[in-house]
Regions:
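Catalytic-core regions of core metabolic enzymes
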Residues: 1-115
Length: 115
């Protein structure tokens, strides 16, 4: 089960402790300082502007919320929908990292490309 944290500026040691706790419970931490995640047409958690997303097969991962929206805007404008878009957060220490999410997208039958 993913847990999501929008808050920014959380002290680094607190994030490390939270990450360790979440891992011990078999869950995943997304963030902090992230816009959330969305699988268009299915579910959304966070502050993502859902109207720019289109259901499709492109996975999106970014540290920047604004860059996520910009990428998705251009994908959608060109008819390329998204399977899931995830903002991992811009703080120095975050829960899930690019490598972990790339592996998840590679194993996702609904994702054919990753940005």
């Amino acid at each position: 089960m993913p847990l999501w944290s929008i808050a920014e500026g959380i002290p680094t040691l607190d994030v490390i402790k939270a990450h360790q706790f979440v891992e011990q419970k078999g869950a995943m931490l997304i963030g902090p300082n992230c816009p959330g995640l969305i699988s268009p047409g299915k579910s959304m958690v966070g502050i993502l502007p859902g109207q720019v997303f289109l259901e499709g097969n492109v996975g999106v991962i970014s540290r920047s919320g604004t860059l996520t929206y910009e990428i998705v805007y251009h994908l959608t404008a060109n008819g390329m929908g998204q399977s899931t878009a995830i903002g991992i957060g811009g703080d120095p220490v975050v829960g899930l990292h690019f490598r972990q999410l790339l592996e998840m997208f590679q194993n996702d039958p609904e994702t054919e490309a990753i940005v």
